């Protein structure tokens, strides 16, 4: 189930994004970005609709998925 990021309390959203950034370990190119810069980049992805907050009812977990990686038909998640 997709959760509108605007409906999430600001502190909770910040923590969710921070966890996502730490877990992803994404390569940001030759220039190293600060943790806060990476958080701002993910916020921009959410605002632009290029990422979404997803709740799995099956696993009772919340995650951020990029639009490119999101697959509502995945069999190991209960996305709607």
Curated annotation (Swiss-Prot):
What Pfam families does UniProt report for this protein, alphabetically? UPF0270 (PF06794)
Taxonomically, the superkingdom here is Bacteria
Signal sequence interval, chain numbering: none
Q: Which family does it belong to?
A: Belongs to the UPF0270 family.
Name the record gives this protein? UPF0270 protein VSAL_I0295
